[in-house]
């Protein structure tokens, strides 16, 4: 050991152990790097691997999490402390660009010029800096604006199993916010499919939305360290737009479950005792550190939309359950609605929002939303009777209610701009006032004579009436 110690220079270390994505590095006495410091390791193939200090083990050794593949590393390799955490570029020049967890461009273009660099580990805004305004963010998506309206500067969770349309809904939100509100968006791909990220990038170029968006990716083929930290990289870029540019920013995280999953993988390698269902014991702390930075201040706001994969459709799993605690609104996507061919497959009875309050949205909006939910709930209760005895056994009032419920169910669907190439239907942005008007008319029975098929994939109520007229 004495021989190794002689080789250790100031700020230089030697790799002593490699366990998958976690490695131990021994430094000279008194030259230990701090927790969260970035350390660079030059590989034999010329690439530089960045690792982040996670633990001090004693005996001048630190345990680090790799942000890239560890293949090609051997014990005894040199490692150099940088004296700072991982820092990433921020500012207007990052718009239209695509980065990895370290802030390096991955769109085959040069690194952005004239940018500041922020460390990815930062404190949440102080208590007195935070703003508590209640203002609705209009999305142009009927089911969202009516039943689970989003708060400007709030946190929204998109819950759903595999393949129910979370990513498509996120893409539509990015399109609508950029075209209708002119706001900046930061899209953070955490542990999802590279193909989807690639599709999203080219779709955004085609629609012209890319110039208002910064994209950060740590996809599912990358080591757990990158997937665990890429959320912080995207958040740091969004914080700059909020604090320095004074903008209202949309931060998309697809998928927040993968952040937890990566933490779980790393936690086991770091030697921590697993807790419930094998998750890391620090699950609440890690989630809190990320979520508390997503907030509105006096300068601007960050509205965050987070896709939440629900393992085996089990909402009581610790990962989605921990996420729930931080959210202002939940948009639940349901497989049973996908099976009906209704998109977006938002469950109108499971989705909730703290904003659905007459003091925030107004009496009319609140009443229409509650009436819609009441009719759909009653229809749900009647479905067992219909399945056993058939429609004929229902009372006249119930028959009318079922007919209206089926129209409402279909009218909650909507063609999306980002899905035009698949559906062949032009996308529709529906203002809140038109949404309320349409559902109010259905509830009042003004369209009882129109067949329910006309309501499927329509924009506002005028689109439905135009279809009826065209087919006469």
From Swiss-Prot:
Source organism, top-level taxon: Bacteria
Cross-referenced Gene3D superfamilies: 2.40.10.170, Bovine Mitochondrial F1-atpase, Atp Synthase Beta Chain, Chain D, domain 3, P-loop containing nucleotide triphosphate hydrolases
ATP-binding as UniProt keyword: yes
Parts of the chain that traverse the membrane: none
Any one GO MF annotation of this record: ATP hydrolysis activity
The protein's Enzyme Commission number: 7.1.2.2
Record keywords, A-Z: ATP synthesis, ATP-binding, Cell membrane, CF(1), Hydrogen ion transport, Ion transport, Membrane, Nucleotide-binding, Translocase, Transport
Chain sites annotated for binding ATP: 160-167
NCBIfam families: atpD
HAMAP family the UniProt entry points to: ATP_synth_beta_bact
PANTHER family noted in UniProt: ATP SYNTHASE, ATP SYNTHASE SUBUNIT BETA, MITOCHONDRIAL
Protein's name according to its UniProt entry: ATP synthase subunit beta
Natural source organism: Lachnoclostridium phytofermentans (strain ATCC 700394 / DSM 18823 / ISDg) (Clostridium phytofermentans)
Encoding gene, per UniProt annotation: atpD
